[in-house]
Amino acid sequence: MSRKLDRSRELQKRAEALIPGGVNSPVRAFRAVGGEPPILVRGEGARVFDADGNGYIDYVLSWGPLILGHAFTPVINAIEKAAEKGTSFGASTPTEADLAEAVVHAMPAIEKIRFVSSGTEATMSAIRLARGFTGRKYIVKFEGCYHGHSDSLLVKAGSGVATLGIPGSAGVPDELAQLTLALPYNNVAAVEQAFTKFKGQIACVIVEPIVGNMGCVPPAADYLQALSDITKREGAVLIVDEVMTGFRVAYGGAQELYGLKPDLVTLGKIIGGGLPVAAYGGRKDIMDKIAPLGPVYQAGTLSGNPLAMAAGLAMLCHLRDNAMEIYPRLDQLSADLVNRVLDAAREAGVALTANRVGSMFTWFFTDKHVTDWDSAATCDTKQFGQFHGAMLDAGVWLPPAQFEAAFLSSAHTEQDIDDTVAAAREAFAIL
């Protein structure tokens, strides 16, 4: 179909005069796919609507938080009820402990938890805590894994920086970047070599248990357990970054899925019900090093703010009470969608592979199975951009970058899947 974008175009032009690039996060500018970004004004269930009235089946879902769909009534009601009592106090509220209890019950690795306002804050704080606990300075991360935009973690970070075609970010001092050891994902030997070379100097290993920021890339068999074994042996802290996967791939996150018990966990997205919130938590002996109990400082004016706590609690309570229905259905719908689009690509002669874990997935425009950053980098990003534009024209909203994961929600229906597959067939025909 032909979409009118007159109003979106006007709004984008106005924003560009006031905001760098007209956006508050680079991927929203559509630089990776071309075309004009629609300006969204409303979401309902599995759909979003732009300023010109165009509707789209949404597989971005605010980059993962909206597992129950847009404007989910119990979450909206919880936010409204909390807002009537006050939007922020800069002091503790009962709902903080309620949400903390819900998370601790869901994830056995978390004995204590601290709420913050973004995933970047969570991973940055977890890194600082690991360094403070161990007295060591080096950290290990993996190529193509994105853990937010703190300086230490913007090294071979996949996702946004990969989309921009740069290895990291200007403004990160070399002296700081040199303390971050970026290793290939799914490669245990590389981790062993790093710990041999930097014996007794590595504070932590931080890993996305299922990568979402070079597209969806699951761990190889026993990879996560190997990381756990190595860090335990070497006295380092294992940080599992579940900002994206927590409560998404299972109610207990990737930890439940893979039987993992890390030292620290970072969370975000779903635990805020669509509002800005994140957290880090883990072993009591480590968490008790945080001020005011210990010497590792972290604070925030809006940390644990009542609106986000209420939204997150409503979200987690619904997921907990309906987990036996929600997660199997999401898995089945996602498998159906991913496989049928793969079939359509094969019939059209388009090279396409896919990875999926639960309701988190990516179609890769390559004939290679993607297991790490090197294989992800073989994707035809230009062809993905053409596909993305054709899908938008057909009313399907996909992540505007090849190296981002897509998601389903409980609001998606079988008809949504049928319509998306039909749109993909038409898109493949014109590539």
Swiss-Prot record:
InterPro entries: 4pyrrol_synth_GluAld_NH2Trfase, Aminotrans_3, Aminotrans_3_PPA_site, PyrdxlP-dep_Trfase, PyrdxlP-dep_Trfase_major, PyrdxlP-dep_Trfase_small. One of its GO terms (biological process) is protoporphyrinogen IX biosynthetic process. It comes from the Bacteria. SUPFAM superfamilies: PLP-dependent transferases. Homodimer. Belongs to the class-III pyridoxal-phosphate-dependent aminotransferase family. HemL subfamily. HAMAP family: HemL_aminotrans_3. The modification N6-(pyridoxal phosphate)lysine is found at K269. Gene3D superfamilies: Aspartate Aminotransferase, domain 1 (3.90.1150.10), Type I PLP-dependent aspartate aminotransferase-like (Major domain) (3.40.640.10). One of its GO terms (cellular component) is cytoplasm. GO terms for molecular function: glutamate-1-semialdehyde 2,1-aminomutase activity; pyridoxal phosphate binding; transaminase activity. Pathway: Porphyrin-containing compound metabolism; protoporphyrin-IX biosynthesis; 5-aminolevulinate from L-glutamyl-tRNA(Glu): step 2/2. It is found in: Cytoplasm. Its EC number is 5.4.3.8. It catalyses: (S)-4-amino-5-oxopentanoate = 5-aminolevulinate. Pfam families: Aminotran_3. It is an enzyme of class 5 (isomerase). Its cofactor is pyridoxal 5'-phosphate. This is Glutamate-1-semialdehyde 2,1-aminomutase. The keyword Isomerase applies. It comes from Koribacter versatilis (strain Ellin345). Keywords: Cytoplasm, Isomerase, Porphyrin biosynthesis, Pyridoxal phosphate.
